[in-house]
Amino acid sequence: MAKIVKVIGREIIDSRGNPTVEAEVHLEGGFVGLAAAPSGASTGSREALELRDGDKARFLGKGVLKAVSAVNNEIATALVGKEASNQAEIDQIMIELDGTENKSKFGANAILAVSLANAKAAAASKGMPLYAWIAELNGTPGVYSMPLPMMNIINGGEHADNNVDIQEFMIQPVGAKTLKEALRIGAEVFHNLAKVLKGKGLSTAVGDEGGFAPNLESNAAALACIKEAVEKAGYVLGKDVTLAMDCASSEFYNKENGMYEMKGEGKSFTSQEFTHYLEGLCKEYPIVSIEDGQDESDWDGFAYQTKVLGDKVQLVGDDLFVTNTKILKEGIEKGIANSILIKFNQIGSLTETLAAIKMAKDAGYTAVISHRSGETEDATIADLAVGTAAGQIKTGSMSRSDRIAKYNQLIRIEEALGEKAPFLGLKAVKGQA
């Protein structure tokens, strides 16, 4: 048992050049946990609040000194002397001290950084790897799996400065036998995609998550480029590699007229038409997972989409559920989607994140662990994916160290666990077992 002796917050810089909160939690015996909060670009309206200073003279208003001050003062005072291994209690103290529904007093960025740093410090004090401690906190000690990567190799929407409406076009190396082999397949497809794009005279500049961000005439053209790259790399699309998309539909949904307006290809759809547009893409390409295929508030549209596609495609709720058990519970009751994206800064603590994963799994939904578009070298989500045996992870493409840090941590974990952490491949995806 080790008590907290010191909590430190500081302002550091994320992968987009914006400030974020880093926290250190120090325990008796010299054990230290260090963690940083990520930050999203396309955010759900019901996410926990990321506290920014709003001082335009400093970091264009994006400073986080208020959140850092909360860590160094109110949070530190409340936590010193508390037992670090009581993660749920630590998180509850911060949530109650904040006292708001959406963590707007201290900021989810402050509370999450401390929550994760505390878990890391507790793991260190127990002489355990973080993934093993997370499995204990999850009530599933010793139960692990290596996640199937969903690699975002063409970026559009809010993650790129191009004319592609759909935010992420991803590959899943389902033919791999191990996580390490999956990363090799992903890297080979990524490099071949660069050749395909260059051959078409298209840009190979990368977006926030390390994927390419070319100007393409349509979403189908993005899928066609990926198909060509998969084949060029010597793999079979649909067998070795499957496809996934994050539509981030809320970003092009017009609330006034209820239409999905895809400006990049000059098309507008009603809610049901958009579902059938996606259905058409699924018939043409082996797309096994679609995230946020409707606006976060269009629950009727989601219900229809689940009815049409839910038995054959994993339908992931991101902006829809925002890692929030209250919203997820309602979605489960109404038969909305069949999977949840897990981003721990949407809810703001490790305990609440684990509760969302458990609720999803208990209801037969899958849980996909995810990064944010603004990241740091912090690789906690790799341990979270393994320690909860979630089965799937989204942490970007095969470039940018902020993305690769997570993949490299997964390589280390797979090496340490060997056969104790099976790589499930396509079986991890809802509707594909």
Swiss-Prot record:
Gene Ontology CC, one term: extracellular region
Cofactor: record remark: Binds a second Mg(2+) ion via substrate during catalysis.
Record key words, sorted: Cytoplasm, Glycolysis, Lyase, Magnesium, Metal-binding, Secreted
EC number: 4.2.1.11
Reactions the enzyme catalyzes: (2R)-2-phosphoglycerate = phosphoenolpyruvate + H2O
GO MF entries: magnesium ion binding; phosphopyruvate hydratase activity
Enzyme class: lyase
Entry's family note: Belongs to the enolase family.
Subunit structure: Component of the RNA degradosome, a multiprotein complex involved in RNA processing and mRNA degradation.
This protein's name: Enolase
Gene name linked to the record: eno
